[in-house]
């Protein structure tokens, strides 16, 4: 899925997750964006993008999802955490400083057939895939490099979920 505006990577990442689970229905960027709480009256007033708390709002608004996020991992996550969720068939939404702030969805992990992690890569669904000759919506990132730069460098306040290691794993609620 390609985002239709400069600010909509967060809601488009959520759309990708809904689509992955067959829960897309009639949801679109605009309807998901409307589920986010307003940032009016905060230091982010006028910011059109999506904070972690707003991403959580989206899945709570859609309903029927269990959510694991940065808030559940105060000491951060690492490669084995992401690999575990992927092994369970759960895509991992991440927000980091790519493009000055960008949500993407990790959908795969490749060890490159080695024991070391320094050559491992993430496969991401990227709604702003404009940097290669094949706008297919996918990207490949060195896994350790992304993890060591997995920050918004103070762009979001703690009251909105913070700025470091922002991730969200939404999966259909059990039971």
What is each PLM-predicted segment?
Residues 1-73, 156, 162-165, 170-175:
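Cysteine-nucleophile protease catalytic domains, especially the papain-like/related folds used
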Residues 11, 15-18, 24-26, 36, ...:
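Generic ordered-secondary-structure signal
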Residues 13-14, 20-22, 30-31, 95, ...:
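Generic detector of ordered, mature protein regions
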Residues 23-24, 43-50, 76, 114, ...:
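Short, exposed beta-strand "edge-strand" segments with a Pro/Gly-rich flavor and a Y/T-containing core
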Residues 55-66, 99-106, 127-137:
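Short, surface-exposed, charge-dense and proline/glycine-enriched linear segments
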Residues 71-127:
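Active-site-adjacent substructure of cysteine-protease-like catalytic cores
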Residues 109-175:
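Noncatalytic regulatory segments and standalone regulatory/sensor domains
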């Amino acid at each position: 899925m390609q985002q239709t505006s400069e600010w909509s990577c967060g809601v488009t990442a959520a759309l990708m997750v809904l689509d992955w689970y067959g829960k897309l229905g009639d949801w679109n960027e605009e309807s998901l964006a409307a589920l986010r709480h307003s940032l009016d009256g905060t230091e982010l007033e006028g910011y059109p993008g999506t904070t972690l708390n707003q991403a959580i709002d989206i899945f709570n608004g859609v309903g029927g999802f269990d959510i694991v996020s940065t808030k559940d991992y105060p000491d951060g996550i690492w490669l084995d955490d992401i690999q575990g969720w992927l092994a369970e068939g759960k895509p991992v939404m991440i927000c980091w400083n790519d493009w000055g702030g960008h949500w993407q969805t990790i959908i795969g992990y490749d060890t490159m057939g080695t024991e070391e992690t320094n050559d491992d890569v993430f496969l991401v669904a990227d709604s702003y895939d404009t940097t290669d000759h094949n706008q297919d919506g996918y990207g490949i990132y060195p896994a350790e490099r992304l993890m060591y730069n997995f920050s918004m460098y103070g762009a979001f306040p703690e009251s909105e979920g913070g700025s470091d290691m922002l991730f969200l794993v939404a999966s259909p609620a059990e039971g």
